[in-house]
From Swiss-Prot:
Record localization: Secreted; Vesicle
Protein name: Cathelicidin antimicrobial peptide
Originating gene: CAMP
Family recorded in the similarity comment: Belongs to the cathelicidin family.
UniProt entry keywords in alphabetical sequence: Antibiotic, Antimicrobial, Cleavage on pair of basic residues, Disulfide bond, Immunity, Innate immunity, Secreted, Signal
């Protein structure tokens, strides 16, 4: 009498299961997002949660910090988004939308997880006040240059007037 153990099909199934076991970890590794892909997914989430009328698109991504290799560990991110011309209700990808002229710019910081299966992020965005700070720096420099120039002009006038000697009639 023949048993199932002696059957050649059992050996084939064992081989198939072994191969599947070897291939599955490779499939899991393939589900790791790149740093930029994780940020773009986070922006999609920001757009879904936003109450603003238009979509936001990545304007500037800060350099990737050094990271460990674990895709399940939250990775720090910081980037800037800008308002686009596309309404939030559109089916377009934000990457296909033009930036809105004088659109709102937001600075975003937080963490993302690169494991695509977990698809997790914790990001907060605020109005980008850096351009106003730069504008303030510009006016301060202008004031310093004008103030310094006025001091020089004032000193030259004072020197000129000091060099004028009253003429005496002889």
């Amino acid at each position: 009498m023949k048993t199932q153990r002696d059957s050649p099909s059992l050996g084939r199934w064992s081989l198939v299961l072994l191969l599947l076991g070897l291939v599955m970890p490779l499939a899991i590794v393939a589900q790791v997002l790149s740093y930029q892909e994780a940020v773009l997914r986070a922006i999609d989430g920001i757009n879904q949660r936003s109450s603003d009328a238009n979509l936001y698109r990545l304007l500037d991504l800060d350099p990737r910090p050094t990271m460990d290799g674990d895709p399940d560990t939250p990775k720090p991110v910081s980037f800037t988004v800008k308002e686009t011309v596309c309404p939030r209700t559109t089916q377009k990808s934000p990457e296909d939308c033009d930036f809105k002229e004088d659109g709102l710019v937001k600075r975003c910081v937080g963490t993302v997880i690169l494991n695509q299966a977990r698809d997790s992020f914790d990001i907060s965005c605020d109005k980008d006040n850096r351009r106003f700070a730069r504008l303030g720096n510009f006016f301060r420099k202008v004031k310093e240059k004008i103030g310094g120039g006025l001091k020089k002009v004032g000193q030259k006038i004072k020197d000129f007037l000091g060099n004028l000697v009253p003429r005496t009639a002889s």
